């Protein structure tokens, strides 16, 4: 499992899981798996980072 702070970051922005999944164009199930620490593709991480309004260079704020 990979370490990430996605859930905490998402909640700090007061964004629901459903809303973030929609913005990132991924399924809610995929987002749930990632928040639980399951591995994810770089492409999926990129979608999430951009949907959160971050730059790709800010990846470490969410994913480690």
Could you describe each region identified by the protein language model?
Residues 1-13:
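A short, Lys/Arg-rich alpha-helix, primarily the initiator
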Residues 42-60:
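DNA major-groove recognition helix of helix-turn-helix/homeodomain DNA-binding modules
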Residues 14-32:
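Short alpha-helical DNA-recognition segment
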Residues 5, 16, 41-44:
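Residues that mark the N-terminal boundary/hinge immediately upstream of a DNA-recognition element
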């Amino acid at each position: 499992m990979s370490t990430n702070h996605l859930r905490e970051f998402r909640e700090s922005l007061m964004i629901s899981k459903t809303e973030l999944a929609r913005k990132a164009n991924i399924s809610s199930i995929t987002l749930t798996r990632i928040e639980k620490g399951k591995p994810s593709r770089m492409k999926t991480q990129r979608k999430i980072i951009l949907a959160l309004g971050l730059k790709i260079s800010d990846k470490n704020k969410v994913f480690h």
